[in-house]
Amino acid sequence: MKTHRVLHKLFLMSLLTLLVWTPAHAVAQTEALTIAAANSLRDALRTLLPTFESQHPAVTVRVIYGPSQSLRKQIEEGAPVDVFLPSLAEEIDQLDKKGLIIQGTKHIYGGTSLVLITSPVLPAPVRTIEDLRSIPIRRIAVGDPKTSSVGKVAAQFLKFSKLDPTLKSQYVYGEHSRAVLDLVAKGEAEIGVVYRTDAITDSHVRILDTAPAESHSPIQYGVAIVWTARNISGAGDFIEFLLSSRTQEELKKYGFDQAQDKIGLVRRQEVKP
C-alpha cells in the first residue's frame, strides 16, 4: 500500500511538471527566417526588425548583409535564404530568369536617389555636380560596378553626365556602398557617389547634390521569396509587414521614396512552391 501511494505521488508530480513546462516550451519554439539584404538596408532593418519580431513571436530573423550582386550569386550557388532584399530590383529579375524566385512574390517596396557626398570634416571644394566639370578633384569614390548595384548606377550617371572621361583617372573603387562611405569619411576620397539611403543616416558624410533622375535607371528596392525558402509563411508575413503603411512611413526616415507597388500583398496561398 505504501509503495502504491509513493508511485501515485510520483505520477502526480510528473503530471504537474508536464502541465507546467510543456506549454512554455511550446511557446518558446520559433522558426528562423533568413534574409539576404543589401548593405544600404542595415540602418533601416536595425529599427524595423524588432517590431516585426514582436508582431510575429514565432519567427526569429537572421540577416546576411552584402552587396546585392554578391548576395544574388550566393543564392544562385544554393545559399539557404528565404527572402532576398537587393537594392536594385533587377537582381531579383536575374534570379527569376533562372527559376529561383517563387512566382508572384516580387514587390517593389521603395525607391531612392543617387547623391554626391563629401566629408563634413574635410569638405571638398565642390558644391554641386556641375562643379566637377571645372574644379579639380584628387579622388572620387564610387562603387565597383562588378560587385555592387550602386557602382552600376553611378557608372550610368557619370557616363550620362559626360563626366566619365574627365574623372576616370581619379576613381577609387569601393566593393560596396559602405566601403564608398568609409573612403569619404576617412578622407581617402574628397567626393563619393552613393544612394541617399546610404548617406542620410551617416554623420561622417554630408550630401552635396542629387543626380538627375534621368541620368540613371530607376533605383527600385525590391523583395521576393527565394524558391528554396524553408520558412515560406514567415517570408510572406515579412513582405506584408514591409509593404504596410506604418513601415512605409518609417522607411522615409532612411531616405526611401514611397513604395510603387502596394497591390497584391503576399498571402500564404500565393507563395507555395
Feature-to-residue mapping (PLM):
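Generic low-polarity alpha-helical segments
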Residues: 7-8, 55
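Active-site phosphate-binding/coordination module
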Residues: 104
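Short hydrophobic/aromatic segments of transmembrane alpha-helices and their interfaces
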Residues: 8-9, 165
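Bacterial N-terminal signal peptides
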Residues: 9-22
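N-terminal secretory signal peptides that target proteins for export/translocation
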Residues: 1-6
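Exported/periplasmic ABC-transporter solute-binding proteins
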Residues: 27-56, 60-65, 69, 73-79, ...
